[in-house]
Design a protein with these regions (language model features):
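Dynamic "connector" segments at or just before major functional cores
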Residues: 1-142, 148-167, 175-184, 410, ...
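Short amphipathic alpha-helical "interface-anchor" segments enriched in bulky aromatics
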Residues: 58, 288-323
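A short acidic (Asp/Glu
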Residues: 127-129, 200-207, 224-230
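Short, surface-exposed basic-aromatic patches at helix termini and helix-loop junctions that form
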Residues: 179-186, 203-213
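Acidic, metal-coordinating catalytic cores used for nucleic-acid/nucleotide bond scission
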Residues: 192-202, 220-223
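An anionic, glycine-rich sequence signature occurring as long contiguous blocks
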Residues: 210-305, 392, 396, 400, ...
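Charged, amphipathic alpha-helical linkers/stalks
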Residues: 306-367
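Extended alpha-helical coiled-coil "stalk/arm" regions
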Residues: 352-419, 423-436
Length: 566
C-alpha cells in the first residue's frame, strides 16, 4: 500500500524539524534508526489485536504480545514515552495527510475526482474538571468529549480522520477541509455526502460561494409539503429503487428562493403526492434519481464503517490528558446570544421611551395651540355679541351679526371636539407606549440578570488532541491494513469480515512461528469448524502465492494445521 514509506518519512521529517527548532532537546525513544522505530509503532498499531486499549494496559499485560515477531513485548513506560515524543514533534496532522494520500491512491488509483462520505464520531471524555462540552448522542447528554471527522470513499474505504474540539460544527470546518484535502491528495473532490447537520443554509451558502458539490438532507423536512416548492422538471424513478420517484425543486416563495442558493430534490413513493424525503445541496450535473441513491450509500460506506472502528479499533478510547486553560467558548457564545437579546430589548425600550417623550411634547404643543385658538375665538365671540346688542339698541339690522356669532360658536364647538379627539388619541398612544416601556423595563432586568449569570470568567480545560490524533491515524491505518488483507489474501467467504470479527477469528489465532535463515514459517492451530478450516486454507494459499517477504527479506509462509496435527 505504500504506508511504510509514508510513515517513516513523515515521522523522521517531524523529528528533524523539531530538533532544528529545539536543539537542546533530546528524543531518546524516537530514534532515527528505522529498525528501532517500527517495533514501537507496531506495539501502538496492534493494540486492538492484542486486546489492550492504551499503552498503560501493557503494565499488567501477561500475553505473548508481539514476542513472536520481535522477541519481546514493550512495557508501559517505553510506549508511553515514545507516544509522548511523537506528540512533542507534532506528527499527528502531517501523518494524517500523508496516509490519506496513500489511501486515496491505493483504493481509487488514477486522478478521477473522488466522492466522499463524511460524518462526525463523537466520543465522550469522562472528567470531573470543568471542560468544553457538547452533545453526546450515544449517551443522550451534554458532556466533555472529542469530535472525530471521518472520511470514507465508495465501498466504505477509509480515507482519513481528524480530531476537533467538542464544540466544532460542520458548517465552519467542511469547506476549508475539502480545499486542504484536495491539495494533500492531489485529487479533486467531486461530491461530499453528509447527514442533516450539513443541510442548513449557512453551509449551503459556503458551498455555493466555493462552487462545490454536496448532498445532504433538509433539516425539519417533514414540516414542508409539496405546495412549498415549485418543481423543476418531471418526476423520475430513483436509481435501484423502482418504487420511488424524485424531482428537482425550488422554494415557491420568490423571496425565499432568491435568498437561498441551495437546490432541492424531493422523493416520494409511487402513487403518493407528498414528498417523504427532501434532499438539499449543490448537485452539479447529477440527475434527480441519483440523489437519493447516492445519499443512501452513507449507511454502508460511512455509518457502519465508523461502527467497525468503534468495535474493532478502540475508536472510543481517549489518548492524552494534557490540557490548556482558556475561556469557555460555549459560555462565550451563550453570553453573546444573551447580550444580543439584551441589546434588542434596550433598543426597543429606547424607542418606546423616545415615543413617550415625543407624545408628551405633542400633547403639550396641542394643549398650547388649543388654548390660544380657544382664547381667540372666545374674544371674537364676545366682541361679536356686543356688536349684536349695539345694533339692537340702535334699531339697526343685526341678522348678519347674529349669523357671525353662530358661526363663531360652531367654530368653538368644532375646536373643542377636535381637540378632545386628538387628545384622546395621543393619550391612548402615550398609554400604550408607557405600558410597553414598563413591560420592557422588566424584561430588560430579567435578560440582564440572565446574561450576568452566565459565567464567562472561569477558565475551562481544553484537552490537547495531538496524541489522540496520532492514535486515530494508527487506528485508521490498522483498519485499512485489514481491508487490504481482506481484499488481497482472504478467502472469498471472508471478504466481508469486520475488523472485530477478523481479530477474533484470525489475527488472534494461536500458532507456532519458526524463523529460518531464508524464510519465516507460521503454522496456525486448526479450526473447530470445517468451513472456517477450508476458508483459512484458501487464505493461506492466496497469501503464499503472493510471495510476501518480511522486513529483513526473508520469505513469509503461513499455513493452518490439519485437525489433530498441531
Amino acid at each position: 500500500m505504500g504506508v511504510v514509506k509514508a510513515v517513516e518519512e513523515t515521522v523522521l521529517e517531524a523529528q528533524e524539524a523539531y530538533l532544528e527548532s529545539n536543539p537542546s532537546q533530546h528524543l531518546h525513544h524516537l530514534a532515527t534508526d528505522v529498525a528501532a522505530l517500527w517495533p514501537k509503532i507496531d506495539h501502538l498499531l496492534y493494540q486492538p489485536i492484542l486486546g489492550v486499549e492504551r499503552p498503560r494496559c501493557f503494565y499488567y499485560y501477561q500475553g505473548d504480545g508481539l514476542e513472536a515477531i520481535y522477541g519481546f513485548t514493550y512495557k508501559y513506560l517505553t510506549l508511553e514515552q515514545f507516544l509522548g515524543q511523537l506528540t512533542r514533534v507534532q506528527v499527528g496532522a502531517p501523518l494524517a495527510e500523508a496516509l490519506s494520500a496513500v489511501y486515496a491512491q491505493t483504493w481509487y488509483p488514477g486522478d478521477e475526482p473522488l466522492t466522499i462520505f463524511v460524518d462526525w464520531h463523537t466520543k465522550p471524555h469522562w472528567t470531573k474538571f470543568y471542560s468544553h462540552s457538547g452533545h453526546i448522542a450515544m449517551w443522550g447528554r451534554t458532556m466533555p468529549g472529542t469530535k472525530q471527522f471521518m472520511l470514507n470513499g465508495f465501498d466504505g474505504r477509509y480515507l482519513g480522520g481528524w480530531n476537533y474540539p467538542i464544540d466544532a460544527h460542520m458548517t465552519h470546518t467542511l469547506v476549508g477541509l475539502e480545499a486542504a484535502l484536495e491539495c494533500s491528495l492531489g485529487r479533486l473532490i467531486a461530491c461530499t455526502v453528509m447527514d442533516s447537520e450539513g443541510g442548513g443554509l449557512p453551509l449551503g451558502e459556503r458551498y455555493a460561494a466555493a462552487g462545490r458539490c454536496y448532498i445532504s438532507v433538509l433539516p425539519g423536512e417533514h414540516t414542508h409539503c409539496l405546495a412549498d416548492f415549485v418543481l423543476e422538471g418531471s418526476w423520475e424513478v430513483v436509481k435501484d429503487d423502482p418504487g420511488r420517484e424524485a424531482v428537482f425543486a425550488r422554494w415557491a416563495d420568490p423571496r425565499h428562493a432568491a435568498e437561498d442558493p441551495r437546490r432541492f430534490a424531493l422523493m416520494r413513493p409511487l402513487g403518493r403526492s407528498e414528498p417523504t424525503r427532501i434532499y438539499t445541496g449543490q448537485f452539479a450535473d447529477r440527475s434527480a434519481g441519483e440523489i437519493p441513491w447516492l445519499h443512501r450509500q452513507r449507511w454502508p460506506c460511512n455509518e457502519l464503517r465508523i461502527r467497525d472502528l468503534i468495535h474493532g479499533a478502540n475508536l472510543n478510547v481517549n489518548y492524552g490528558y494534557a490540557y490548556t486553560e482558556g475561556p469557555n467558548r460555549t459560555r462565550q457564545r451563550e453570553w453573546e446570544a444573551a447580550q444580543e437579546r439584551v441589546a434588542v430589548t434596550e433598543r426597543q425600550l429606547a424607542d418606546h421611551r423616545a415615543a413617550v417623550h415625543h407624545l408628551r411634547q405633542r400633547l403639550a404643543s396641542l394643549q398650547d395651540a388649543y388654548a390660544a385658538q380657544h382664547r381667540d375665538l372666545e374674544r371674537r365671540l364676545v366682541q361679536q355679541r356686543l356688536e349684536v346688542r349695539r345694533r339692537q339698541c340702535l334699531g339697526q339690522a343685526a341678522t348678519r351679526a347674529q349669523q357671525q356669532v353662530d358661526g363663531l360658536r360652531r367654530q368653538l364647538d368644532t375646536l373643542v371636539r377636535r381637540f378632545r379627539q386628538r387628545q384622546r388619541c395621543l393619550l391612548r398612544q402615550l398609554h400604550g407606549h408607557a405600558t410597553r416601556s414598563h413591560q420592557l423595563s422588566g424584561r430588560l432586568l430579567q435578560r440582564t440578570a440572565l446574561r450576568d449569570a452566565i459565567d464567562t470568567q472561569t477558565l475551562c480545560r481544553e484537552r490537547d488532541l495531538e496524541k489522540d490524533q496520532i492514535m486515530l491515524d494508527l487506528q485508521l491505518l490498522l483498519a485499512n491494513l485489514h481491508d487490504w488483507a481482506t481484499e488481497s489474501y482472504f478467502a472469498p467467504t471472508w471478504h466481508t469480515l469486520s475488523l472485530e470479527k477478523a481479530t477474533q477469528m484470525i489475527y488472534r489465532k494461536a500458532g507456532r512461528v519458526t524463523w529460518y535463515r531464508d524464510r519465516v514459517e507460521v503454522v496456525l492451530e486448526p479450526y473447530r469448524y470445517d468451513d472456517q478450516q477450508r476458508a483459512m486454507e484458501v487464505t493461506c494459499a492466496r497469501f503464499n502465492a503472493a510471495n510476501v517477504h518480511w522486513r529483513d527479506g526473508r520469505l513469509l509462509r503461513i499455513s493452518v494445521a490439519s485437525p489433530g496435527e498441531f
